[in-house]
Amino acid sequence: MKKFKKKPYIFLSSILLSQSALSVDINSSIGSAGSDGESGKTNMSTSTGQAGTTGQRGSNGGRGQGTTVDTYGHPGGDPSSGQQGYADGTGGNGGNGGNGGEGGGANTPFTGRPAGNGGRGGNGGNGGDSTASALGGPGGNGGNGGDGGLGGWSTVAASIAGRGGDGGNGGKGGNGANGSDGTSGKDGAKGGNGFDLTPEMEGDSFIIQGSVSGGMGGYGGAGANGLNGTKGGAGGNGGRGGESRNYAENSGGNGGNGGNGGNGGNGGNGGNGGNGGVGGDGIIVSKNNVQITNLSTVVGGNGGSGGVAGSAGLAGAGGKGGNGGDVPIGSPTTRGKRGEDGAFGENGINGRVGNGGAGGTAINISADGVILLNQGKVLGGTPGSINAQPGEAIVVSGKNSHIINDIGGEIWSSGLNSKAVEYEAGADNGIFEMRTNSIVDGVVDATKISNSKLVLGGNTAKENSTFIASKIGNGRQYQGFSNYEVNTSEGSTWNLIGETTALTPWTVTEGTLAIVSDHSLGSTDGALTLNGGVLQTVLNVNSDRRFNLTAESLNGGILTDGDLTLTNVISGVGGLKKTGNATLILGGQNDYTGRTIISSGNLFLTGEGGIEHSESVELSKGTSLNISSTTGGTMVNNLTGDEGSHVVLGDRFLTVNSLADSVFSGEFGAEGE
């Protein structure tokens, strides 16, 4: 466990200069807020484009020449459609159709022959479409159809007068323009950092006594509104049917059909709101090999809110259909049909509200060899919206870091999908240590790094703390650690409760690790290493995992308040010290080489179990070594025992290899003797 050296400190709370220390005041340091994003621009040009040119009126039909009895007047000429309106303008109206030509006279001496019929009126021109890209006008109106020509005349009273010409059809109204889409708002800027601990700063120890906060991210710009679609042009009216004339009665012409109205333009889509800016970091550490003690509160900046969405433009109305053409009074002919109204355009789609900015990181460690002792509160920034990423409390990208959440220390994520501590790829050899009465709210993620370690620590005597093993593993609170250690002060205990199937190779270096079940130690593929610390069994425990003894001193060992049965091998250069009144049962062919000390309780060897590689076996008063259940007896080295100790043989043989000065003052006997 790393200890702080006595070096000059930098107190981040008040200005103080001396020969041995440098202090800097960053009390209540808050990073500057990020700039707000610009709102989207609405294309609101009010200039109107030139209207489309109105189509010219159709030529009147020529008068019929009385050269034959069945000559008809020529139809009126159809005009050209109105020209398309320019951008931002109004579509041109269609030209009116020309009137039908007058019917030719029946220039004949024969009675009963018909005079010529009047010519058909010309069709009205179609209205021009409006194709405005921003503030367009409606489509042009269709031209009216030309009237039908008069029926022809006859020089003979008994002849039949010519029929009036049909009226021309009205032109179709031009389509309205689609409204322009609103532009999206700009994203807000990232908030400023609260404090940067840079390589240029003097000192290698820093104490944070004043609160530090990252700046808030800028607000996203508002999206612009979409423009409304424009109205379609009205259809042209149908031409009036021509009248018959001369001495005899005959029918007039049919009325022309009204033109259909133009379709309305679609509304423009609203612009999306800009995204909010990311909150600034509270503290950025880019100076290698520094020690930081946090006594206050460090908070990441809040994310900026997303911009407001632009509203959709409304659909343009369709143009009205043109009226049908009239017929002469008293004529049995048909009035023209009214044109159909144009269809409404479609409404635009509302824009999307901008996403809020992610919350800022409270402490961002990019340097190597950083030790962070947290006795205050570390909290990630709040996101700018529900769907935005909350800020992490601590992010580590530098190697060889050691984060200690000390007594009273708190590390808080700021919401779902946020992490209390995130080790980024490459931040290898990271250590995360928690101590009694500390709080970690959120995931501690070491899945991206190698040789990571989770430590249950402490530096106060006779602490009694609890850790829940089921919090370890994929999808759990503590993820991706490759090593696990108990390294607290002597006399203090960490109680490991609950179960996990994760691979958790525990090492007990100092202090006591207490269990009620072997399942608390994780998969049996992970060995338990006693490196000077104590494993305590509170209840009876059976285990098939390997044990390693690495400490040459015998301050640690196994404390059996409940019987402990080990069926696998105990290895290593260290010794085994057994305390507690319950029994330690060994069934493996153990090959550890250190001393075996039975200070209290019983050591029971069974099956092929043996301790023949152990340097010595030492029994205290009231303890026993029992080999009665071994397969064929066993061997021990340098057996010693106090008066009142026992070796229980049963019907097995015990071979003792002892030095001349080894003294056994206890008793040998069969089981029960």
Which stretches of residues belong to each language-model region?
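Extracytoplasmic loops and strand-loop junctions of Gram-negative outer membrane beta-barrel proteins
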Residues: 267, 347-348, 356, 495, ...
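Gram-negative bacterial Sec-dependent N-terminal signal peptides
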Residues: 1-23
